[in-house]
Amino acid sequence: MAGRGVVEEIERLDPEKDFERISFLSTNHDFPWDVEQSLSLAFFKTYGIPSISALLDETAEFRDRPQKRYDDTELILAEILENGIDSERGREATRRMNRMHGRFEIRNDDYLYVLATFVLVPLRWNRRYGWRRYTRQEEQASLHYWRALGKRMNIRAIPDSIEDLERWSDEFERANLRFSESSRRVADQTLGLFLSWYPAPLRPLLRPAVLALLDDELLDAFGYHHPPAWLRHGLDLALRARATIVARLPRRSRPRLMTRERHRAYPGGYRLEELGVPGLEGRAPG
């Protein structure tokens, strides 16, 4: 499937019933790179909430096994999207995710905020940097997809519209986004992971570029200096230029499947039962 074929199929589908198919087509055919980048930013955004960062800091996973933690999260979400929420592998991936979280007392609002970032950050990225804009079906399907997954994680009171979810998220941030030492540590560890993927001489140049993608309120929550305006502007222009170029390239003929790609923590491939935090399985959240 290529070209207009993806959009044409999406336009024939119902976002309330066919949200899994729409999300798969959108993510794996048309926007694999964009979704990967925006979800990385979404994770960063959650670290600015002290109650979330304190838990991540306590587990020490980002300190001791940052690449495995990153790959496990990416692969669990990919297993669910590529195979289906209620497929055998999708259910097992969700079960493992629930058990990873189940030994900790996590507030429903913290769960809901993480889910909200997974909906809202990719939407905002697409509106600014997508090579085409999401259709209304894609936006609605994203909400229904994450609502369905959230319910299987026993997350309560998930708003049923993007507008309500955005209002809730903004209010939550105003009340909770602030500096904490745990936020700084987890942000430092994650930033160190991202930079480790590039040659050492480039890392001092790439660090401010990554920070330029974060908003000022989040930078303040991490205790980071704000990057210069010219860097933000230059990066914005570069990402918009990329979108213009990608729009003129031939469309992908086959989906990009994250589960089939090589991952640094699993150079020889992975088994589903390897995903998750060792020794931290317990009850599912309730």
How should these model regions be labeled?
Residues 1-286:
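Mature, function-bearing regions of proteins
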